[in-house]
Swiss-Prot record:
Annotated pathway: Amine and polyamine biosynthesis; ectoine biosynthesis; L-ectoine from L-aspartate 4-semialdehyde: step 3/3
CDD domains: cupin_EctC
Protein name: L-ectoine synthase
Entry keyword annotation includes Cytoplasm: no
GO BP annotations listed: ectoine biosynthetic process
EC number from the UniProt entry: 4.2.1.108
Family annotation (NCBIfam families): PRK13290.1 (NF009806)
Gene responsible for this protein: ectC
């Protein structure tokens, strides 16, 4: 059994940040469960381009407001606490945070934990 609190992660190597977001990595590849789980903060007023060409991501918004645009179609979906989206087609998308957003994110294959986005908006597929 694995039990962790957010306090166990903040300020450690399991917390990764960029200018627009901070991701606290609860479950990673080393845990050998087939997925990873992050608690991610998206900064208010930011626009973020992402394209997870190597991963499937499910996201559940638990705080804040914003929107996500599926770039291939121009479809825009409002996001608020209680909204989930699944990037099951490796969708290129833009995430716009109106307020700070807190998201619970599940990745498959699992993240190693040190990933940051490339210039093309995706996480490299790391093995260690």
């Amino acid at each position: 059994m694995i039990v962790k609190s957010l306090d166990d992660i903040i300020g450690t190597d399991d917390e990764t940040s960029s200018d627009n977001w901070t991701s606290r990595r609860f479950i990673m590849k080393k845990d050998n469960v087939g997925f990873s789980l992050n608690d991610t903060l998206i900064k208010a007023g930011t626009t973020n381009f992402f394209w997870y060409k190597n991963h499937i991501e499910a996201v559940y918004c638990i705080e804040g407001e914003g929107e996500i645009e599926k770039l291939e179609t121009g479809e825009i979906y409002k996001l608020k606490a209680g909204t989930m989206y699944l990037l099951n087609e490796h969708d290129k998308h833009e995430l716009r945070a109106k307020t700070q957003m807190r998201m619970v994110c599940v990745f498959n294959p699992p993240l190693v934990g040190t990933e940051t986005h490339t210039e093309e908006g995706y996480y490299p597929l790391l093995t260690e």
